[in-house]
Structure formats: C-alpha cells, structure tokens
Regions:
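Short strand-turn segments of transmembrane beta-barrel domains in outer membranes
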Residues: 196-198, 206-217, 225-256, 273-277, ...
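Transmembrane beta-barrel wall of Gram-negative outer-membrane proteins
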Residues: 248-279, 290-327, 335-357, 394-401, ...
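Outer membrane beta-barrel strand-and-loop segments of large Gram-negative receptors
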Residues: 385-391, 426-428, 432-436, 527, ...
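Periplasmic N-terminal accessory/gating domains of Gram-negative outer-membrane beta-barrel systems
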Residues: 81, 88-91, 110-216, 226, ...
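C-terminal beta-signal and adjacent terminal beta-strands/loops
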Residues: 664-689, 693-697, 709-717, 721-773
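Surface-exposed extracellular loop regions of Gram-negative outer-membrane beta-barrel proteins
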Residues: 368, 413-416, 458, 478-534, ...
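Gram-negative outer-membrane beta-barrel transporters
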Residues: 442, 554-556, 575-670
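Periplasm-facing N-terminal accessory domains of Gram-negative outer-membrane beta-barrel systems
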Residues: 19-110, 114, 118
Length: 773
C-alpha cells in the first residue's frame, strides 16, 4: 500500500500549495432565485480579461491566480438576468461569493452557448457525452415521458438489443462491464426488464456524464464504460408537486423546503421525493389486445428520496435513499424478480480561505434477484456493498487537480442448480482499496490530462496500477484533435453468457472459484479481468450550437471471464490436456471460462439545436469478436452498422406544441443457425443401452456459433406534446406517442422446432397527462 500513501501525500502537498498561493482568487456557488437550485454551466467571467469559467455540476466556480486589484464580475445563463458586481481583491485573498440569478423575460441564447463553449474548452470531449434534462427530453418518450434508457440508445457506440429484456452494450463491453453511479453510489442494476425504462426519474436528474471509452482515473472497477448520474436538490423556496399518468405507468414527485432559502440567508434544508411505477402488465391486454402471447408481463416500482442541507457559504450535505424493484413474469415459463435498496450521505465543502473543494461520501447497498423456472431449482443472487470515498478538487486556469481515495467492501452470494440437480452455493467477501490522481495541464494549444489509479483487490491479494491519459490539441477555436486511453481492471463477474440474446436474470460473483486455471497453454494465477482502451477523434464547434465529432476507437479486452455454456461434465477430474495444462479440460468442466475480446470501430455525431428546433444524427461502425479456449466468434450484440436520427421542433401559439421523432436503423445481429433436426434418444441409467420402446425428444443440430445474421432492424418513434400554462406554478401537459409508428416487424426470436416467430414490439400508441403544481 506504499503506492496509495505516496499518491495521497503528493496530492495533499499539491492541495496545500494551491491553498496558500501568492495570487487572489474568487470562488463561489451560483443559484437561481425561483427554486434555489444550483446552476450548472453558468458563464462566470471577469469583464475585460481572459479569466472565465463555467460552473460545474454543483454550481461551483473558482477563478484562481488573479492579480490583485479591481474587477467587474459577470455571471450569465439562459433565461436569467445577468448578475454583475464590482470586486476589489487584495493580494493572497480568496473571496467567497453566493450568487443568485433572477429570471428574465428575455431569452439570451448566447449566454448558454457561451457557457457550453466554456465547458467544452475545459474538457477533452473524447468519448464523453454530457446529458442535461433538456437533452434527455429531446427523445420521444415511449412510456409517455422521457427516460435515460431511451437517450442512451442514440449515443454512438452504444448498442441496445431489444424492447423485451434488451441490454446495453458499450463498444464491445457487456452490461456487467458498465459502471453506473447515482450521486456517487454504485447501482448494479440500472435498467428494468422492459428495455426502454431505467430506475432513474428524469425529473430528478441534474446531469448525466456518459463515457464510452478512455475514462479518467477517478472511475474504475469496470472494463467498458461509465454512466455517472447526478440528481438535483428539492425546491428550496416553495412546495411543489408533479404527477403524471400514462398508458405504461405513473410518476409522482413532491419537493419543498424544510428551512426556506432567503436573500438574507442562503442556508436551507429541502427534500425531494420521487416514485414511479408501471401497470402495463394489467393494462396491456386491454390496450394492446393484438400483442402476441408473451405480451408485456413487466412490473416495476422505483422510489427515490433526498434531503439537502445548504450552509450559508454554500457547503452542502445530501442524504439519499433509494429502492428499486422489477418483476418479469411469463406464466409457465419463468419469473424473474429483483430489488435494490441503497442509502447514504454526501458532503461538499470549500473551507474559508481555501482554493480547494472537498467531497466525501458513504453509501451502503443491497441487491437481491431470483429466477424461478419449471423443473429447475430457483436461482438467487445477492450483491451487498459498503463504499466510502474522499476527494479533493482544484480548478485553476492552467492547472487542475482531482485526488481521491475509496474503500469498498463487497459481499456476493449466488445459488444455482448444478449439473446433476444439486443446489450449489457460492459466497464471497472482499475489500477493495483504491486511490487515484487526475491532473489537467494547459500549455499553449495542448491540454494534457495524465492520471494514475492504484486499485487493490484484497481477495486476490492483487495491487493494480492503471495509467490513464487524455490529450487535446486545439487546431483553432473551433477544431480540436483528441486522444484518450488507459488500462482498466474488474473483479465483478456475471453469470450471463455472450451467447445469451436475452437474459432477465444476472447472478453476480466476486472471484469465482470454478474457473479455468489455464488459458491457451498459459497458467493464470490471477483472476482479475483486464482491458486497454485507445480513442482518437476530432471535434468541431460550428456556428451557434452546431457540434460535429468523429472518433476511432479500439478496446482490447485481453482477459475476460464468461459463464461457460460448454460445460457438460462434473468438475472432478484433473487430467491435463494436449498442451500440458488444464485449459481444454476446464472448457468442458468449469462453470466459468477465460476469454479474450476485441472491439474497434468508427463513431460519427452531428448535433444542432436552435431556439425552436433540434437535430441529432449519430452513426456507428463497429466490430466485436470474442475468443475462448477453442474458437473465435462474434457475440450476439455485434451490430455492424447503427444509425440514429432524432429531430424535434416547437410550434403554434406561444410554441406550446412540440413534435419529436427518432428513427433507428441497424444491421442484423448475429445468431446461430440450425443445420437440422434429429431424434435425441436418452441412454438408460448406468449403461449405454437405449430403451427400444422409448421415443426420443426432438433435438437441434446447430451450425457454428453466430455465423448467421438477422434481417436489418429499423423503427420510427413519434410523439406530439401540448402544454397549457394554467398559472405561475400550474402547468398541464398532454403527450401522444407512437412506438414503432409504421409497425416494422423486427424479429425477436424463432422457435427452432415449431418455426414460430416472435417479433419485437409492434406499433404501440401511448397517451400521457402530467400536472405540475
């Protein structure tokens, strides 16, 4: 652990030197007067100088290394009047401000564009997508309201496998390889069984940062991607409520102050409560009687609670609790159910006279899932964790720093039916200790972000060093060349296989015991999964809000662990194979096997929005392969081409009408073809004789894995919204939507013996009403 101590000492020395520099600084938080919410992406500038910054997700800003003297500070944001104040700074002074923006009847679109450009000027955009509530609402809401799961499907590099139990695959990574955070706590199951709904209520979201590759050192423990969700606080000025009903379900929100924020004292306490759920399992047969026999047997309930404390200087404490649940019940076939409960606290503080921002958090979570099938003993999985973290932030004009340390205690338990019907149980405990350092250095046209992560896996006694690097070169004010890369590790394993097109149940393991000890003739002592990323891209900021990006990426998953679908023997023999190891023998006897993976491709994106319209186009060209002990194959989510076109515009009197559309075109997924059918005769017990009076079952002779391709997939989703402003606070909105508007018959699966075909969801009209009070 000497490496962790060294990183901590270095970071604290840097933080100390930053806190006692010889130049003046201005720091603070920006709020809006209506609800007391923080204002991310507000433009903070010193007029007549080059000093400026956009507020971060916490509404925080720091203008550092300023000369002493007089300055005119300006803060601006869309829909608000500019805030201006005159400041006299003394040498070595750190001035703390609480800024409250007042609403304006004049829409200054250039203020938002300026803030967005300031934000983009301070980041490397390689494989990073910032989603705001405005962006999330650009997608037609298939359930009557916008959802994060629907927007993720249009991000280049993300593949979604279907409406019924579909999963998200990010540039060759599987769902278990995606790290999902909610206000700092890890969410292991963020999406419901019905594929277009997440556990997050869009109206509680402040921002979402999606990294599809090459993410920085503060994130780890996963091989593929990061989805970092931040929620807002409750209204700090007045009590509000929001309720919506639609053909799929409902949503309820209540919020307000427990201690009101006032102009004289910004200190406050507020609450935010959210509940959303579904009733489509009950209403589906009545509203959509033309659905096939599988219907929509889904049910979910999500609860979210947050209490936020704000001090007079902007310091913040959040207490958060969640409970998510999901059920998919196919009578006579299977029943999958899971619940996820979590809670904890987060502290954000910037001490007086300090130029750094401190953040700490502690959370506990409990995830439980079960799968019940006829003639098979129930499968269960438990994932329990306790995580604590501490971070130090510094944002300067030419140098920024983020140092953090974390401790995660994880417990997994998985029960399943073994090869002879015996109930098997695996239970593991582990502790993960980690520390990381991210820096950002601006030198001329270059912005360089080196980072390093130390991750210790206690159950493996393994200490991993993971270097990360981002580089941006500004060709001009509008054109940037970007690079991002690094090395990543993961201990968590799922019981799903790359051969499973749909799997509503995932078991979780930390350090599986029943796994190969050799892979392709090489002995493997350490069972940590490993990957490397590299991304090279270019971005262009055009007139107004036009953004164009192009990226080439490669992900080398050079050690992965997959659930073994080839197991046919008990794990009792220790016989070496032809290579002198146990790899081939383990390929047929172990519950888990090693694999290698490779993903590479090209992603293109164009994004353009005006006052009353939006246009978004994303195209992905991707290649994914897997290699196990014996064969190289493509997994079922290897989609070669994927195109998404999204558009929307507002019209009518007061622009109260809104129309949105999304069209998705994708090449066919791989599948394993059938060569023929045969009579499968069972042997009598304890001998090789067959019963001459017994008829065999119908067996399938399979072709090599995933060498066939399904037909092309395409679908159009539409929505039309009308908003009525009833009073200052009261607003009524009606939404009519069409999923799969032209009723494209996209294949879901076919029964190999009866040749019955089941398609993805047909045309589904939806209707929703929402009322804000």
């Amino acid at each position: 652990m000497k490496s962790v101590t060294l990183i901590a000492a270095l970071a604290l020395m840097l933080a100390g030197s930053l806190a006692f520099g010889q130049t003046a600084s201005i720091k603070g938080f920006v709020y809006e007067s209506g609800s007391g919410q923080t204002v991310p992406m507000a433009s903070v500038t010193l007029e007549g100088t080059k000093f400026g910054q956009a507020t971060d997700v916490n509404g925080y800003f720091l203008l550092a290394k300023l000369p002493a003297g007089p300055f005119d500070l300006r803060v601006s944001f869309l829909g608000f009047s500019d805030y201006r104040t005159h400041l006299e700074l003394a040498p070595d002074e750190v001035r703390s401000l609480i800024i409250v923006l007042e609403p304006s009847t004049i829409e200054l679109k250039e203020a938002t564009i300026t803030a967005e450009r300031q934000r983009l000027a301070g980041i490397n955009p390689a494989s990073v997508h910032r989603l705001t509530p405005v962006a999330l609402n650009r997608i037609p809401g298939l359930s009557g309201q916008a959802d994060l799961a629907e927007y993720l499907q249009v991000i280049p590099g993300i593949i979604f496998t279907g409406d019924r139990g579909g999963q998200f695959y990010v540039r060759g990574g599987e769902p278990v390889n995606n790290l999902v955070k909610l206000d700092g706590m890890t969410i292991v199951s963020p999406f419901h069984s019905v594929g277009f709904t997440s556990v997050f209520d869009t109206q509680t979201i402040s921002s979402v940062d999606v990294s599809t590759a090459g993410f920085g050192a503060q994130y780890g423990g996963r091989l593929s991607s990061v989805i970092d969700v931040k929620t807002r606080a409750g209204n700090r000025k007045e009590f509000c409520a929001d309720g919506s009903l639609n053909t799929f379900g409902y949503s309820l929100i209540a919020e307000g102050p427990l201690k009101k924020m006032t102009p004289e004292n910004p200190g406050s306490v507020s609450f935010l409560l959210s509940n959303k759920g579904s009733w489509i399992r009950t209403t589906g047969p009545m509203l959509y009687p033309y659905l096939d026999s599988t219907g929509l047997p889904f049910r979910y309930d999500d609860y979210f609670a947050k209490v936020s404390f704000i001090g007079s200087k902007g310091d913040q404490v959040d207490i958060i609790g969640t409970r998510f649940s999901d059920v998919a019940d196919y009578p006579g076939l299977m029943r999958s159910a899971w619940t996820s409960t979590a809670g904890g606290a987060r502290l954000l503080v910037s001490p007086s006279g300090s130029r750094v921002l401190f953040e700490s958090s502690a959370f506990v979570s409990d995830f439980r899932a079960s799968l019940t099938q006829p003639d098979i003993k129930p499968r269960q999985t438990f994932y329990n964790s306790a995580e604590a973290s501490f971070k130090v932030h510094y944002r300067g004009p030419l140098f920024s720093l983020l140092w953090g340390t974390e401790m995660n205690v994880i417990h997994t338990l998985h029960t399943f039916q073994g090869i002879k019907g015996i109930l098997m149980e695996d239970e593991y405990f582990t502790t993960e200790l980690l520390s990381y350092l991210e820096t950002k250095i601006t030198a001329g046209n270059f912005m360089i972000e080196p980072g390093f992560r130390i991750h210790y896996y206690a159950d493996k006694s393994d200490l991993r060093g993971e270097p990360r690097l981002k580089v941006r070169y500004s060709v001009s004010d509008r054109i940037n060349l970007n690079f991002a890369g690094g090395f990543y590790s993961q201990n968590l394993v799922s019981t799903t296989s790359t051969e499973d097109v749909v799997n509503l149940f995932q078991g979780y393991y930390i350090g599986p015991f029943w796994i190969q000890s050799d892979f392709k003739g090489d002995h493997i002592d350490n069972k940590i999964q490993l990957a490397g990323h590299a991304v090279l891209g270019a971005s262009y900021l055009g007139p107004g809000s036009l953004k164009l990006t192009a990226e080439l990426y490669v992900k080398d998953y050079y050690r992965m662990i997959s659930y073994n679908r080839n197991k046919i023997y008990e794990d009792v023999l220790r016989v070496k194979d032809d290579n002198g190891g146990y790899g081939t023998r383990g390929y047929l006897t172990k519950y888990f096997i090693f694999e290698k993976g490779l993903a590479y491709g090209l992603d293109l994106m164009a994004d353009w929005s005006g006052r009353y319209y939006t246009v978004y186009i994303a195209y992905s060209l991707g290649y994914v392969t897997r290699q196990d002990e014996l064969i190289t194959y493509v997994p079922h989510f290897d989609r070669r081409h994927n195109l998404n076109v999204v558009g929307g515009f507002r019209f009518g009197r007061s622009h109260a009408w809104s129309a949105k559309a999304r069209w998705n075109l994708g090449s066919g997924f791989p599948f394993t073809q059938s060569v023929g059918l045969y009579e499968d005769l069972s042997l009598l017990a304890n001998n090789f004789m067959m019963d001459p009076l017994m008829s065999g079952e119908l067996g399938v002779w399979y072709a090599p894995i995933n060498e066939g391709r399904l037909p092309w997939y395409h679908r159009l989703d539409l929505s039309l919204e009308r908003t009525w402003k009833l009073s200052r606070k009261m607003e009524l909105q009606a939404v009519f939507g069409l999923m799969n508007a032209y009723n494209r018959q996209n294949v879901f699966y076919m029964d190999r013996t009866t040749y019955d075909r089941i398609d993805q969801l047909p045309v589904l009209p939806t209707l929703g009403l929402s009322l804000k009070l």
